[in-house]
Amino acid sequence: MTCLYPGTFDPITNGHLDVIKRALKIFDEVIVAIAKSEHKKPCYDLEKRKELALLATQNLKNVKIIAFDNLLVDLAKELKVNTIIRGLRAVSDFEYELQIGYANHALWEDMETIYLMPSLKHAFISSSIVRSIVAHGGDVSSLVPKEILPFLKDQSCM
């Protein structure tokens, strides 16, 4: 069985990788679906975020990276995948994710959402925290995959 793990991944973090690895224990394949997310005004463009995710997951089997700019439910139908994985770091994430999960289910009755918590050591990591630390010249080597560190040196978008 295959699941979709959608997100902005701006940039992909060790927290994201942790959720991917946990999902692989449940599913045969994880499709990481990188959203255009113009409303979030991402730091990195869609192609760069996809490139970084490909680098970060290159050693993981059964992980596919795609980019999309349409409704998640439409993408899921197109791929014939009815299960979405979402990572939850804190209770504050749950309220938002629950609303999105209900909306997706309202758009497609077959759509299911499974919420996974990251490991405790990754529970505080977010892409926005990573961008903030980089913007202030801090070390994010423990927060992001080593494969993408060289790309974070360019702080022009942070």
Curated annotation (Swiss-Prot):
Superkingdom of origin: Bacteria
Encoding gene per record: coaD
Binding site residues for ATP: 8-9, 16, 87-89, 97, 122-128
Molecular-function GO term, any one: pantetheine-phosphate adenylyltransferase activity
Descriptive protein name: Phosphopantetheine adenylyltransferase
Cellular location(s): Cytoplasm
Job description of the protein: Reversibly transfers an adenylyl group from ATP to 4'-phosphopantetheine, yielding dephospho-CoA (dPCoA) and pyrophosphate.
Native source species: Campylobacter jejuni subsp. jejuni serotype O:2 (strain ATCC 700819 / NCTC 11168)
The protein's annotated pathway: Cofactor biosynthesis; coenzyme A biosynthesis; CoA from (R)-pantothenate: step 4/5
The keyword ATP-binding appears for this protein: yes
